[in-house]
Amino acid sequence: MQSRVTAAVAALMMVMPAMTAAQQAADQGRFIDAPGHVLAHRDRIEPVNRMLSERFEQLLPGLMQETGIDMWLVLNREYAEDPVFFTLVPEPVFAARRTTMLIFHDRGEEGVDRLTVNRYPYGDPYESAWEGGNLDDQWLALGALIAERDPQRIGINVSRDWPVADGLTAALRDRLMEVLTPELQARVTSAEELVVRWLETRASSELATYPQIVSLARGVISEAFSSRVITPGATTTADVQWYIRQRFHELQLDPWFHPSVNVQRAGLECGKESPFCGTSGVIEPGDVLHTDVGVCYLRLCTDTQEMGYVARLGEETVPDSLGAALATGNRWQDHLTGSYVAGRTGNEILAATISACEAEDMICSTYTHPLGFFGHAPGPTIGMWDNQGPTPIRGDWPLYESTAFSIEGNVKVQIPEWDGQWIQIKLEQDAVFEGGTVSYIAGRQTEWHIVR
């Protein structure tokens, strides 16, 4: 078994040096022509559980102290789990069993105790505080445990503004309050800040692993936007969508939404004020392609959009104006990532990005979001496609270190070869904010995919 684990981890890490070198390039451009190695499900258990242990040891104590929660309760029932539950349990866990209670107690310098009050104990990395018995006994045991430990602020997952922090059902909350004394009831508070910080913060081992995960998604896009998949005049956008979906299935990767593919072409109107441009149908020579894909692997998710071009007969590369259009999209990315400053809110980053684009008469739209355990993760929202002004609550969240984002948005550019028609360059590349700098996790698209 040890040899299997060692081989699996080695296979997972073998692509890292090249990725690091690519990230050091000035523009961080990188072309990935095929997906890399994917671990078998059995071999994914060790790295996932190792990353979970690191998160518990390196992140959770500081986050609980930062948010002022000294006891965090994550209470679940089978098939009605709190969304946070799956980020807290070791592999291979598929669901809560009966009623599953996770308790985290910050004891200061002694660290955070990770406890369960369950019919079935989890074992490492949890200590069983109670097991067996019936449901009434289980709830009484939870109440007794809380009373014995006497926490000052008891965090529960209820939130009006953050969906992923609102996983405690009404029935479980009522049952909890029944087993607490009035004094302890008064100490119960929302754990929403702790939940957001737990979900948005990446451990060092996750940052080391993430490039491989993002490169898988980018590699499948390269396959899809090539003559291996597309025959101009015959292949449809739906064919490419389903190729991508099937390819993820073959690689045993979990998509978190169905891939989309669309085309823009000369003569198909793209209004200057249109929020999105593109249509579906048969792919023809001269078409501009766009796709949006997202997968999750080793519990970390990707969200990627890239552009392609279908060469006409005799063309070896894209028209110069399309090359310039993609460069404009990269310039918008630079304005956005250059506006990332720790402590700035999402709304402040958006305003700085818009100001920089307007100074260059660039028509841009920014709708960037955090990334991690979820494709649309909590953290600072930086614009919405239908709102380029401040976003209440989520846009007011500040930027922290060791957080990942999908750098998502678009620019509009006129194409002389298309009689001045507008074209939309829609990009989404995954990045991490670390050490005061934004680095693309597996590079970014700086050259077109070309179907020859």
Regions found by a protein language model. Name each.
Residues 1-9:
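Bacterial N-terminal signal peptides that target proteins for export
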Residues 8-17:
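Bacterial N-terminal signal peptides
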Residues 18-22:
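Sec/Tat signal peptide C-region and signal peptidase I cleavage site
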Residues 23-452:
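Active-site neighborhoods and metal-handling regions in enzymes and metal-associated proteins
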